[in-house]
């Protein structure tokens, strides 16, 4: 019996859609689409303390999620053109996420873990809890770009006030494909927001 699966594979510099066919003994893999990816530098408000005339623009880094979505859809169409598909899997980098409003619509592009705002969030958290306490709860090595610190940094941004849901990048794409907003545990465990013992969101 033949089984055909499609993999959506997104990395920090490129993405691709692959079609795999398993005949019970061997797996044949073929590429259906490939497209570029990378954080986009987005100018923000001007810094009033900058020495240059008019101030220096603060730069944020965001993912062009709609360009990725277009590349994914093209790949899925090509995969379907080549034959029926039994399942779709999604693999992306961790920690980054999209914010959704109360109607389930995306609020702007997802911020990139390469943005300087991550360090601001990390400093605020570590002023309250030390890294050993955090490790005891989430089991993660300290990294300033962990989702926990990004979510704290969100509190200083207006769009976060409109957000009702946050979905990690693969969960966001799965939501767009299926209409179901869910969090997958193994990826959620990279956020720093999951209790490593309880294997659920940490209320603290």
Segments predicted by a language model, with ranges:
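N-terminal glycine/serine-rich phosphate-binding loop of ATP-dependent small-molecule kinases
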Residues: 1-109, 136
